[in-house]
């Protein structure tokens, strides 16, 4: 049996009514430079530590999704203020058990980007 993968994840693509505006929001959150390849398709080239994101134009209304982006941060409160200033909407705070750590639970927060895609800020 061959253990080689079928392929690799090239990028994560988010549908957007305004792909460039959404790419600019995400550039503030995770870094990178938005590049508009053609009308309705914008790619956010990541810094060396990031994942490539692309934004595909659509006229369809946003729908609930089962996929979201987790953003690793050093300081939750500082990151919270920054994503709110960039245009995110705070949804809720949750706590997760972290086996092996002195503290029993670690907080993370859920947000919506300007087009309604959910994402989380997770403490490093």
Set out the residue ranges of the language-model regions.
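Conserved short beta-strand elements that form part of the metal-binding/catalytic scaffold
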Residues: 30-66, 118-124
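Mid-chain, well-packed structural core segment of small domains
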Residues: 63-88, 92
């Amino acid at each position: 049996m061959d253990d080689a993968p079928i392929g690799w994840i090239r990028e994560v693509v988010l549908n957007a009514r305004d792909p460039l505006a959404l790419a600019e929001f995400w550039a503030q959150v995770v870094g990178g430079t938005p590049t508009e390849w053609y009308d309705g398709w914008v790619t956010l080239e990541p810094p060396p530590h990031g994942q490539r994101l692309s934004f595909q134009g659509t006229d369809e209304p946003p729908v609930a999704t089962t996929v979201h982006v987790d953003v690793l941060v050093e300081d939750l409160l500082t990151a919270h203020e920054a994503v709110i200033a960039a245009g995110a909407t705070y949804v809720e705070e949750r706590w997760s058990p972290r086996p092996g750590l002195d503290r029993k639970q670690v907080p993370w927060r859920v947000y919506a980007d300007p087009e309604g895609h959910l994402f989380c800020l997770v403490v490093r």
